[in-house]
């Protein structure tokens, strides 16, 4: 297998869905076999490649077609003000992308805010949903044990409102357990993504005013999700509370939970080898 990189796997598709008319979605596409769509979270500067470049190679080597999709209004995808719950819009964008690419069914890997999109996708399009892998997903309402919004979400909104290198470093400090991993390369790469399209920042805040995060709660519908699901969480997550993982496995008919120690909100990056082994085994045997 030749070495994968961002530029050689990069492409755009144009989708037409409700609220996303003639809308360009950016993705990185590599490999052949069953489709695995990986969807990043909602922090400023987030993108498919930056979130999952430590995972795409092992998944392709294992025989999967891997698609790293940029969410609407993030990274290289077109921008938009969302008038509905973000998870609904995210799910709709996945449906549109799958239609253009000719993919009938896909396994879905989603984290953080995009986790709400995975849950909505599985609810609305169960026949097109393979297995689900969720990492600290949003969209599950309040916590029994933790005041919300948590520290990481507060810093995320601060970075959207006041974009600066200092604010970015503050947010990254609560992304990772091992602070030595916050390198200049990581910071500058994320900062370049933030600066690529300032409209993304403005539109995120406008969208949040129209539909607050507190309105995202698919908990009552969790028992309807029949897909086999692996839920993963960082024990030290400072964005989404760990007890939400228990809520998922208590209410979804076929869900299991794995908690990574010494891990905050980026298991697929901070513990890439362990994450890849766990998730590939789940896809093959779960």
Swiss-Prot record:
Coiled coil: none annotated. It catalyses: 2,6-dioxo-6-phenylhexa-3-enoate + H2O = 2-oxopent-4-enoate + benzoate + H(+). Keywords: Aromatic hydrocarbons catabolism, Hydrolase. Pathway: Xenobiotic degradation; biphenyl degradation; 2-hydroxy-2,4-pentadienoate and benzoate from biphenyl: step 4/4. It is an enzyme of class 3 (hydrolase). The record marks 112 as: Transition state stabilizer. Signal peptide: none annotated. The active site is at residue 265. GO terms for molecular function: 2,6-dioxo-6-phenylhexa-3-enoate hydrolase activity; 2-hydroxy-6-oxonona-2,4-dienedioate hydrolase activity. The keyword Transferase does not apply. GO terms for biological process: biphenyl catabolic process. Its EC number is 3.7.1.8. Residues 173-271 form the AB hydrolase-1 domain. One of its GO terms (cellular component) is membrane. Substrate binds at residues 42-43, 51, 111, 180, 190, 266. Catalyzes an unusual C-C bond hydrolysis of 2-hydroxy-6-oxo-6-phenylhexa-2,4-dienoic acid (HOPDA) to produce benzoic acid and 2-hydroxy-2,4-pentadienoic acid (HPD). Homodimer. Belongs to the AB hydrolase superfamily. BphD family. PANTHER family: HYDROLASE, PUTATIVE (AFU_ORTHOLOGUE AFUA_2G14860)-RELATED, MONOACYLGLYCEROL LIPASE. This is 2-hydroxy-6-oxo-6-phenylhexa-2,4-dienoate hydrolase. It comes from Delftia acidovorans. The lineage of its organism: Bacteria, Pseudomonadati, Pseudomonadota, Betaproteobacteria, Burkholderiales. The gene is bphD.
């Amino acid at each position: 297998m030749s070495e994968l990189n961002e530029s050689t796997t990069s492409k755009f598709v144009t989708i037409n869905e409700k609220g996303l008319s003639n809308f360009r979605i950016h993705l990185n596409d590599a490999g052949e076999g069953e489709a695995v769509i990986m969807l990043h979270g909602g922090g400023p500067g987030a993108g498919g490649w930056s979130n999952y470049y430590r995972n795409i190679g092992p998944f392709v080597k294992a025989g999967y077609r891997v698609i790293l999709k940029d969410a609407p209004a993030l990274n290289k995808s077109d921008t938009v003000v969302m008038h509905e719950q973000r998870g609904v819009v995210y799910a709709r964008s996945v449906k549109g992308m799958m239609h253009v690419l000719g993919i009938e069914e896909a396994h879905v890997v989603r984290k953080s805010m995009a986790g709400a999109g995975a849950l909505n996708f599985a609810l609305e399009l169960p026949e097109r949903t393979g297995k689900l892998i969720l990492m600290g997903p949003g969209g599950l309402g309040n916590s029994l044990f933790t005041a919300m919004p948590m520290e990481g979400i507060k810093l995320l909104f601060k970075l959207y409102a006041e974009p600066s290198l200092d604010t970015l470093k503050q947010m990254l400090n609560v992304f990772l357990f091992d602070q030595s991993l916050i390198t200049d390369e990581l910071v500058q790469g994320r900062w370049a993504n933030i600066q690529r399209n300032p409209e993304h920042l403005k539109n995120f805040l406008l969208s949040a005013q129209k539909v607050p995060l507190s309105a995202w709660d698919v908990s009552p519908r969790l028992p309807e999700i029949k897909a086999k699901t692996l839920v993963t969480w960082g024990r030290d997550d400072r964005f989404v509370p760990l007890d939400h993982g228990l809520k998922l496995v208590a209410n979804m008919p076929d869900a299991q939970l794995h908690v990574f120690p010494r891990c905050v909100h980026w298991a697929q990056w901070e513990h890439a080898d362990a994450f890849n082994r766990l998730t590939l085994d789940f896809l093959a045997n779960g």
